[in-house]
Amino acid sequence: MSMLKVENLSVHYGMIQAVRDVSFEVNEGEVVSLIGANGAGKTSILRSISGLVRPSAGKIEFLGQEIQKVPAQKIVAAGLSQVPEGRHVFPGLTVMENLEMGAFLKKDREENQANVKKVFSRFPRLEERKNQDAATLSGGEQQMLAMGRALMSTPKLLLLDEPSMGLAPIFIQEIFDIIQDIQKQGTTVLLIEQNANKALAIADRGYVLETGKVVLTGTGKELLASEEVRKAYLGG
């Protein structure tokens, strides 16, 4: 079943076209990876899906409903959350307060408390540091906090924008392991990532973007085996 369907999406910033007639879909239960170099349009696509950027053309369907003109907070309420590039945690708030910000649309206190327990179960470091300001966390821990904050809204679809960017190698594999665990627990994932090798290794399917256009698609294994992808993104 298709959870997200993007058809003929275009995004402009003034006279600059960042996304050109892009179409793809994400089926329920999948991890789908979008890979491409800087400037390929990946982040603009995610921002359009999450309601932060209004596309200039095209259609975005989430759970059968068009959302390209829906306000961002209503998209979150419908079951879609994004972890932005660069994490963007609230540095002056504690870990717990950051998590509570992720549940701002949910009024059921018991449900929120249960979700905090789930986040701490998945990210034990966050429980150890729950009363610390987010600014005191390492980059990897801040990424875990950003992911935990997004999961507080119990999304059906999680959008991840460059989750391994700027992280120490010890944290990178842990983040990708966590993404797989999130999928196993029933959350569908759309992943944008410059680390094409790791992104495709965990992906059910992938799309390759160049200068705002989809130029190649296939299963994660097919794209990893593609000579074109290896030369452009995998160093060989």
Question: How would you label these PLM feature ranges?
Answer:
Residues G14, V32, V70, V95-A114, ...:
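ABC-type ATPase nucleotide-binding domains, specifically the catalytic core motifs of the NBD
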Residues S50:
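Helix-to-loop junction immediately C-terminal to a conserved catalytic motif
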Residues I35-A37:
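The feature captures the beta-strand-to-loop junction immediately N-terminal to the Walker
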